[in-house]
Amino acid sequence: MRLLPAALLLSALLSAFHARAAGPMKLADYLALEGPAPSAKIAYGAALSQYAELFLPQGTGPFPVAVLVHGGCWTSKFGGIGQLRNMAGALAARGIAVWNVEYRRVDEEGGGYPGMYLDMHAALDALRAQAGRHPLDLARIVAVGHSAGGQLVQWIAGRARIPATSPLHHPQPLPVRAIVSLGGLADLRGEAALIQKSCGRDTVQLAGSPSAARPDVFADTNAAELLPNGSRTWLVTGELDTISPPRVAHDYASKARAAGDVAEVVILPGASHYDEVAATSFAWPRVLQVIEQALELAPPRP
């Protein structure tokens, strides 16, 4: 693993110290996040929001890959992909390639159900195609999602269990067996009231309307009902997260373990919903450690 220069390491430590002194991040702090420009911007569809940003580390590779999926309550109101460049740049500096995914949200044409799920399929198919052009190690992938993006990456892990009759079925999905959900809201059925309270989103927007052909709208959209999926999931939540409180992580982990999957809950002391996703937050070293552990680049924390 490449070591950070002493000056850069000192700068990172000072940033973390000042961030802790300033207290938990707020929404305005999150919206102000920024990071470096990507190595490439690659369209995976014709719509304006159907693209991903590729961040390549220095060196020859092949590089492990972090797929980043932003949150924002499934809307374009709260930014998203631009804010995740902050994390993307920090990961690339650690030798991890990043595939930062934009997608159609509920307030965009074609977004919501089924569009945003089909966008996840298309974005991962495009990543697979990029492996033929860039030194990417697709045997080492972690999907990292924040908030609404946590729902989508946890859904990604269960894609192989989607019934063949579903509009969301993919015959050969790219396997993603390591998931890091940062303040995710993945259980669409079980957390429907919280999702409505935190984000103002209802079931129809996120899971579609029931029909004779599809009576249970959660059978192909709810990550909690696509278990077991053979993945290992880290559910990372700020102690002070009010959008997706720690209880949500513990409840999902219990369901995953009961189904036979491996799930670990990581609570970030003193952290908010927005500290979970910022490389400039005092919580970042622990989040980074989880991501590197998911990629088998770091040992488990005692």
Summary of predicted features, one role per range:
Residues G80-W99:
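Short amphipathic alpha-helix adjacent to the substrate-entry channel of hydrolases
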Residues K26-A37, A47, G158, G190-E225:
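Mobile cap/lid helix-loop segments that gate and shape the active-site cleft of serine hydrolases
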Residues L235-T237, D241:
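Short beta-strand/loop motif that positions the catalytic acidic residue
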Residues T242-D251:
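Conserved alpha/beta-hydrolase "acid-adjacent" motif
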Residues D125-L194:
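Primarily recognizes the serine-hydrolase "nucleophile elbow" in alpha/beta-hydrolase
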Residues A22-T60:
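N-terminal cap/lid segment of alpha/beta-hydrolase-fold proteins
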Residues G111-G132:
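Alpha/beta-hydrolase active-site loop
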Residues A271-S281:
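Catalytic histidine-centered segment of alpha/beta-hydrolase-like enzymes
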